[in-house]
């Protein structure tokens, strides 16, 4: 788990960290993780095109880690909202959510494309 590896495995500790961040910091953290996830997924696709499926697998694993980090932060926001501690939405946060959604979709589609490449190589 992304947070556990950083000493933030405890839900209360994560909430404490989230409360100490500004909306801009939260949004940029989501954008950064989502962007890295997307880039890693496309690196996986590039490797798969060359038949380097083990490298592709490693890139996809790294991509999933970054997606999970962004998604966990988003989940914390949703939980805080449900607890009555919501944040005021702004364009930057909408942008962050767009990045997260498109990076997850890109990774999922790339996983399917890699499966097709493997079938074609058989």
Model region roles, listed by residue range:
Residues 1-15:
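Single conserved hydrophobic/aromatic residue that forms the stacking wall/gate
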Residues 18-122:
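Terminal alpha-helical segments
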